[in-house]
A protein has these predicted regions:
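ALDH superfamily catalytic-core signature
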Residues: 1-121, 142-146, 187
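Conserved C-terminal structural/oligomerization subdomain of aldehyde/semialdehyde dehydrogenase
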Residues: 13, 111-235
Length: 235
């Protein structure tokens, strides 16, 4: 068997029914965990226009609560792994308008958690896995189609992600998950689906193949074979 965990662009959906304070707190943690350098980091946000302004304000407050007013002075805030990664991630700044963050320092490879809006959907920011603390934020509404249907159309039009995150009414989250495909995910949380060692983890499509953890790991990395032993006492 082949087991590949390949990453990808994991969407984060914020509906107007979401608890914005809790959403901001969990996303501030999930996006700054290792400065976004994790395979299942939330990659971009699809947010209902009615809660965008409140979320941006709450996200900024939660980042400060985690890392202090001067984030660059926080020795626990992770830097980019190397100069190439720093240059690649800061290069995304040109793909939209920064509405929060944007400070960086090449000497220490520091990049502040950054929200970017007005992003072209064919830009590198929206076509490459970010793997850093930069968060493109795309605003949707209920005009014409419902927010839910617009989210589904957007997600299924792109490669299947390694993770899928939804914040809002649980029943709506389950419906969106049923109508999309991803390696795994969370409703009203991020990252935590990987923490259960008894639950299978892996990607689908371009985000990977195969599953591991617990029994799935044993089966994935075991070779089974068929042997026939035939008697010779009669022929």
């Amino acid at each position: 068997q082949v087991v590949l965990e390949l990453g990808g662009k994991s969407p984060c959906i914020i509906d107007k029914t979401a608890n914005i304070e809790v959403t901001a707190k969990r996303l501030a943690w999930g996006k700054t965990l290792n400065s976004g350098q994790t395979c299942i980091a939330p990659d971009y946000i699809l947010i209902h226009k009615d809660v965008k302004e409140a979320f941006v304000k709450a996200f900024a407050a939660e980042v400060r609560a985690l890392h202090g007013e001067d984030i660059a002075a926080d020795r626990h805030y992770v830097r980019m792994v190397n100069d190439k990664a720093f240059e690649r991630v800061t290069g995304y700044f040109k793909d939209g308008d920064i509405i929060y963050g944007g400070r960086c320092d090449a000497a220490t490879r520091f990049i502040e958690p950054t929200l970017i809006e007005n992003v072209a959907l064919d830009s590198t920011l929206m076509t490459e896995e970010i793997f850093g603390p930069v968060f493109p934020i795309i605003t949707l509404d209920d005009n014409g189609k419902s927010f839910k249907d617009k989210v589904i159309d957007f997600v299924v039009s792109r490669e299947k992600p390694l993770a899928f995150y939804y914040f809002g009414k649980e029943s709506e989250g389950w419906e969106i998950i049923r109508r999309t495909s991803s390696g795994g995910g969370c409703i009203n949380d991020v990252i935590m689906h990987i923490a259960n060692e008894n639950a299978p983890f892996g990607g689908v499509g371009n985000s990977g193949m195969g599953r591991y953890h617990d029994k799935d790991s044993f089966e994935a990395f075991s070779h089974t074979r068929t042997i026939v032993s035939t008697g010779t006492w009669i022929d």
